[in-house]
Amino acid sequence: MKRVKRVLALLAAFALVLAMAVPAFADGAEATYTLTINNANGTYEAYQIFSGDLSEKEAGKKVLSNIQWGSGVDATKMGSESAATVAESLTTSALAENFAEDLVSNSKLSSVKATATAKNGTAVFTGLSAGYYLVKNSSIDSGKTYTDFILEVVGNTTANHKGDVPDVEKKVEEKNDSTGATATWGATADYDVGDEINFELMGTLPESYGRYTTYKYKFDDTMTNMTYRNGSVKVYYVKDGSTNRVEISSGFASAWVDGNKKLTVTFDDLKTAVPGLAHGDKIVVTYTATLDANAVVGGNGNPNKVKLEYSNNPNDEGTGETPEKTVVVFTYKTIINKVTKGTDGNNVPLAGAEFTLSKFIASESGSDTVTVNGTEYHGTWNRGVTVTPTNTGNIANVFTFSGLDAGIYRLTETKTPEGYNTIDPVYFEIVATNDGTKVTNMEGKAVNGSEISFTENATNGSLSADVINNAGTTLPSTGGMGTTVFYVVGGGLMAVAVVLLVTKKRMENKR
């Protein structure tokens, strides 16, 4: 009997009892108690597994003796062992959990003693007599897991819902190819249209993972305005506390659907696919996608989401889903207005130009240099892009370069309007910030000694600037000073010749 008492004390510890009090009651009346579940969700059922005689051997310490099967157990299914013998065998938390699962999965429970539904995260049972109870969910809220556990009730008792859910994260790689800065991983990034972008999904196994004999684990990932790069999916596991990734080559299925916009990676049974995993271990999925030409510019960007489907009932085949996690990829645009000075001194549209916008790509072996904020970077300018201008009124002078990453750029006038001087190349940097969901600030900075002023618009992710062409110096035309001088000099020579001719004739006549 002493061993039974020790076991029951151990079960009390398993139950995470946080508070206990015995209310006053009239002589001869059976005492009843409340059981409060914190972090609760859904509806719970309480089954009395063990009953007995409640006594207080020491001040403040209450125990059950004369252990019997409670009203919540079908004693005919419990074999020949007595309740006291079974209770005495439950010497560890693992054995207690296995016992609870055996009762549930093998239909050994009978009458429900009480039910309670969670409200604002708390479920309260009332009118419970002394004993040991198995508490389990009969229903759960969306995104939660079922639980079942055994705990002692010998007074008003408080416990925590012990079911937990796996966690999932999604990250996108951010890199500045104009400066060559070390790439980082986070919730946002900005890229050029056509760039390849690396993504990472990471799911962490829950505390309850060890209670399952099979475990479904499915990543459900949805991209926006991107196209998957064929063959780029890789799957790994990482042990808790380690950074070493071990590639998983079998036991799962990956598929792209909805025009390569949605990725699923499914483990029908993670326990079989990767034996030996435990609470805190991680499953990691990586893949690469390309930013499409129809990507949203500025604003709310291009969100990409992931959720995790997982087994949520160790005694059944049900599944739950985590809330979605989102990362956002941004891209921007630069608008160049070709203008000249009008007679009133104001800028007026000017047609006939052509521009090429090139991006600086950092490289230690690059032969080009650019200076930004006093720092010189080595690299090369890419081939750049040329766009067809749109009109201001009926004048084609607006050049929109869309789908740009943050970085360093060079604007070159590759065709100059007739009668105007070609501008020097203009160097500038695109700088943008966001709050995780939308662009909050845009800035265009002149670099490398250039002069240019931008108007920023974070809502549409644009930087706009006027580029001015000045008329060239006109060469002298017929009737100009050069010709006049020529005429004057020529006329003078003719006059001299006439004078000489007349003088010569007079001299001849005198002879």
Kindly label every feature range from the protein language model.
Residues 2-511:
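Solvent-exposed loop/turn and edge beta-strand elements of beta-rich ligand-binding domains
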